[in-house]
Regions:
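N-terminal intrinsically disordered/low-complexity leader segments
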Residues: 1-14, 25
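Short, basic, alpha-helical segments at the C-terminal edge of helix-turn-helix-like DNA-binding modules
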Residues: 67-74
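Short secondary-structure transition hinges
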Residues: 102-127
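Non-membrane alpha-helical structural segments and their capping/turn regions in soluble enzymes
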Residues: 13-20, 63, 67, 84-91, ...
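Hydrophobic alpha-helical connector segments
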Residues: 64, 78-110
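Short acidic/histidine-centered micro-motifs embedded in hydrophobic/aromatic stretches
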Residues: 43, 68, 96, 110-114
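Helix-turn-helix
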Residues: 18, 26, 30-60, 64
């Protein structure tokens, strides 16, 4: 999953990782509409300029989290393709997918809003 972020957005610095982790937490707690770049920078005690250096817009943060989720889901399903079918495999797939969705629950809650406001995610999702 980090490999995809590296491919799309470049190498991940410690600050970049902290921003994404904080944004995910705040989006999950408060919803996308109530979290600004300032909220995120305040949460991790960095300047707004430092956050903007890594992510020009809030949508860039949402995109990074979206593609991180996509990669995590792809990894979950890749396990199925490489293995013999079994109840254990079905359990592991279900657990993994549910964990990914729970860890990024703001996408499920605010998905319509995200699709309406973010053309890059909409294009990827719709195909």
């Amino acid at each position: 999953m980090l490999a995809l972020i590296f491919f799309i957005f470049g190498p991940m610095s410690g600050t970049r990782y902290k921003i994404l982790r904080a944004a995910r937490l705040l989006f999950n707690e408060h919803g996308v509409a109530k979290v600004s770049q300032r909220t995120i920078s305040d949460h991790i005690a960095i300047s707004p300029g430092n956050l903007t250096y890594h992510f020009k817009k809030r949508d860039d943060i949402i995109e990074a989290l979206y593609f991180d989720l996509v990669e995590a889901m792809n990894e979950s399903f890749a396990l199925v393709e490489k293995s013999e079918p079994s109840f254990e495999l079905l359990y592991e797939l279900t657990r993994s997918v549910n964990k990914n969705l729970f860890d990024n629950r703001f996408f499920m809650i605010d998905f319509i809003q995200i699709l309406r406001s973010n053309d890059k995610i909409k294009k990827h999702y719709v195909g």
